[in-house]
């Protein structure tokens, strides 16, 4: 069995749906509110687990509070191993999410996620060493990500790095990771002075840029490849990127090519945005296979 470790953020999403966002000093009525488990790391672990029979382990931290307890129960229900999720004397991270007009705005309060420092991993390096693939994002401290990426490079462990949300230090990671999956905005933050095609060619078969409703673009070493998105009735886009990353990682562990892994991930993302919650719409493999068959896309 392929072992995947996701090292990253674990949060509770506080989600409000409204028909418009208030201006400064204005109050508007919302249409709905919910609390659902989230955090980019946790979301990507759940997305992978929904698709794969292989072991996926979450490494991170929650607080000593009701949100933390609820999140650990959610990992259990989704077959994500969580023995390496610590409980720390901090509040569990939260994300305040406003849904409107088929899009979202998010404010993150890291809480316990900021406690996932290199020192926090002191007893976990051997566990990480057992992994065939490690998935990272940007909702834990940069120095932790960099330490993990360097460790994985030294130990021939593949790393999928999702540089979200973007930060100036992300470029330090590039030489130590195998796959980079920014969206278009994050890509511009990473490479502000280079044209997209130039960047993709430089990092062929490593840089995969998601373009929302425009699909996904990458360079295969010979030509630029663009894989279109699939039209859908949008309910909630919050977990689309995390679903993409979890599904892309699954494709890689299934020994699919990069392009076929992307196609699978695009289908998974398409299905995810048709239900509420970052994790609520994440599909099972049977759902993805049914959609692939409907679209006459043969990956297996």
Swiss-Prot record:
Requires a divalent cation, most likely magnesium in vivo, as an electrophilic catalyst to aid phosphoryl group transfer. It is the chelate of the metal and the nucleotide that is the actual substrate. It catalyses: D-ribose + ATP = D-ribose 5-phosphate + ADP + H(+). This is Ribokinase. It comes from Lactococcus lactis subsp. lactis (strain IL1403) (Streptococcus lactis). It holds the Pfam family PfkB. GO terms for cellular component: cytosol. Belongs to the carbohydrate kinase PfkB family. Ribokinase subfamily. Its EC number is 2.7.1.15.
């Amino acid at each position: 069995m392929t072992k995947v470790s996701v090292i990253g953020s674990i949060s509770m999403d506080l989600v409000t749906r409204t028909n418009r966002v208030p201006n400064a000093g204005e109050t508007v009525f919302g249409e709905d509110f919910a609390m659902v488990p989230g955090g980019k790391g946790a979301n990507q672990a759940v997305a992978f687990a929904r698709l794969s029979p292989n072991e996926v382990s979450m490494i991170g931290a929650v607080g000593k509070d009701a949100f933390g307890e609820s999140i650990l129960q959610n990992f259990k229900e989704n077959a994500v191993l969580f023995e390496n999720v610590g409980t720390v004397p901090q509040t569990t991270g939260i994300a305040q999410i406003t849904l409107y007009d088929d899009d979202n705005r998010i404010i993150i309060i890291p809480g316990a996620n900021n406690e996932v420092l290199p020192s926090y991993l002191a007893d976990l390096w051997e566990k990480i060493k057992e992994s065939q693939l490690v998935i990272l994002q940007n909702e834990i401290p940069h120095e932790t990500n960099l330490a993990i990426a360097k460790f994985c490079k030294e130990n021939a462990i593949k790393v999928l790095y999702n540089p979200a949300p973007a930060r100036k230090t992300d470029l330090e990671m590039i030489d130590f990771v195998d796959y980079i999956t920014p969206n278009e905005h994050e890509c511009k933050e990473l490479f502000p002075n280079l044209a997209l095609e130039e960047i993709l060619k430089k990092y062929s078969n490593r840089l995969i840029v998601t373009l929302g409703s425009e699909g996904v673009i990458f360079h295969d070493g010979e030509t630029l490849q663009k894989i279109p998105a699939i039209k859908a009735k949008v309910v909630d886009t919050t977990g689309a990127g995390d679903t993409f990353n979890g599904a892309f990682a699954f494709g890689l562990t299934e020994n699919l090519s990069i392009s076929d892994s992307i196609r699978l991930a695009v289908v998974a993302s398409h299905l995810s945005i048709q239900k509420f919650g970052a994790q609520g719409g994440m599909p099972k493999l049977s759902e993805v296979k049914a959609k692939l068959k409907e679209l006459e896309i043969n990956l297996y």
